[in-house]
Amino acid sequence: DDLKELIAFPSVSTTSNREISDWVAERLEALGFQVEQTRYSDHRTVEKVNVVGRRDPVTAAKDGPPGFAYFAHTDVVPADEWTGPGGDPFAPVVSEGRLYGRGSCDMKGSLATMLSSAEQLSAVGQRGPLWIVCTADEEVGFVGAKHMVKHSAAYRDLVAAQPICVIGEPTELKVVHAHKGIVGMRITSHGR
């Protein structure tokens, strides 16, 4: 089960996400995706990895859709005071029909769903390209996304294609067209 395997990676933002990113890349390649990984070191010199996977349809529809892109992140917040079932937040536990573990909601559950969807939809059935994008350091300032924008050729290709995008962040099971985020600005005011 993909979700159980994803939860088992202790990919806390303060540590490297290399192992989970390599696992995602291998899983995408097994599903027929071409994969690009971009690596960087964070401010503590910890290795971080972003993943962009793209699978083209076997037969592209003429004037077909621009494609579909799923976005996820591989890091989770620390689990210092784990109150879920079991004693280890990175050992998935099923209790009363629910799966518990660090990241099961934000956002390893969404990533597992994305991988399952890609597996269910064969490249033969696709009408446009399919992307799955995973960034590092979303929980600590979106550093992975910023790095990907500057250094990923595969991401630039995705942007140029203007696909329909879904970001799998938790929204209490409601479909939303916008979500909380962050904006940085520099404002200069000249007074008298």
Question: Which stretches of residues belong to each language-model region?
Answer:
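Loop-rich non-cytosolic ectodomains and luminal regions
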Residues: 105
